[in-house]
């Protein structure tokens, strides 16, 4: 497989079509269906039998969401991170070789707080990821990649991830804290990138519209945000992050995690903007 390293370095992202097998995707969907069915059944006495359908594998998750059954949706979210099929995605040997070429290092690590399966519900704005860079939120190393594969083909209505191509070349953008959104319960995320609309428009937008066997990769420093899911289906995303242990800044900050682990730049002398 020929890897377009120069394209990645220039644009900050790469899409590899049909990277994962349909069999593996099917396995993960089936596991989610079976787990969500058992959890839903535990909390609902009026349980109706439902057979597995790969195109409707999240039937019980969506049903629980509509019924506002947070016990079910929270339990499913936590359980998804423990699926053996998901670990097959993370530990893929071909992907590791690709990561070595794109990152330019053979000393790679996976951020423990940076992998899981995202569940973006229809019409939900609260959990929509704001404009950010994964280095700021995850740290580990400024030299790293985000690996992204959907469960189910993405459409524009499902709100694919929005990439701002070539923005990684700018380095780390200034990250500010705004608690007003939290207080008004409009968002879970108090952090935002300080950039004008004029400057943001300098970067060409790429929508990460992928099929469920595709692999999307983008740089830790690339600006991106969630699209809005205006469909009536859940947008499922399998995500993990690979970083470079050998990078000087990674060593200086002791490979510490970022905002997602409660570490803010001005509270740790080892953490700094590039």
Segments predicted by a language model, with ranges:
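Extracellular structured ligand-interaction cores
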Residues: 13, 142-146, 158, 205-207, ...
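Non-heme Fe(II)-dependent double-stranded beta-helix
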Residues: 2-10, 17-131, 137, 262
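Short, conserved beta-strand element in jelly-roll/cupin
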Residues: 138-156, 209-212, 217, 241-246
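Double-stranded beta-helix
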Residues: 156-223
């Amino acid at each position: 497989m020929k890897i377009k390293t120069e394209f990645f370095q220039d644009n900050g992202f790469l899409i590899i079509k049909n990277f994962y097998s349909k069999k593996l995707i099917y396995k993960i969907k089936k596991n989610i269906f079976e787990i969500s069915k058992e959890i839903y059944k535990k909390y609902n006495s009026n349980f109706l039998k439902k057979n597995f359908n790969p195109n409707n594998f999240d039937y019980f998750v969506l049903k629980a969401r509509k019924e506002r059954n947070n016990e079910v949706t929270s339990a499913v979210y936590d359980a998804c991170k423990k699926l053996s099929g998901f670990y097959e995605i993370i530990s893929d040997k071909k992907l590791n070789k690709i990561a070595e070429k794109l990152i330019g290092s053979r000393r790679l690590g996976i951020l423990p707080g940076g992998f899981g399966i995202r569940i973006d519900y229809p019409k939900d704005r609260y959990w929509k990821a704001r404009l950010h860079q994964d280095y700021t939120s995850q740290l580990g190393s400024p030299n790293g990649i985000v690996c992204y594969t959907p469960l189910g083909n993405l459409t524009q209505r499902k709100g694919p991830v929005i990439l701002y191509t070539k923005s990684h070349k700018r380095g780390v953008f200034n990250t500010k804290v705004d608690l007003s959104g939290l207080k008004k319960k409009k968002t879970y995320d108090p952090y935002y990138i300080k950039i004008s609309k004029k400057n943001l428009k300098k970067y060409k937008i790429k929508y990460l519209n992928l099929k469920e066997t595709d692999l999307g990769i983008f740089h830790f420093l690339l600006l991106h945000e969630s699209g809005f899911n205006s469909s009536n289906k859940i947008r499922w995303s399998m995500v993990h992050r690979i970083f470079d242990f050998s990078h000087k800044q990674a060593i200086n900050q002791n490979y510490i995690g970022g905002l997602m682990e409660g570490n803010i730049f001005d509270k740790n002398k080892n953490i700094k903007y590039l």
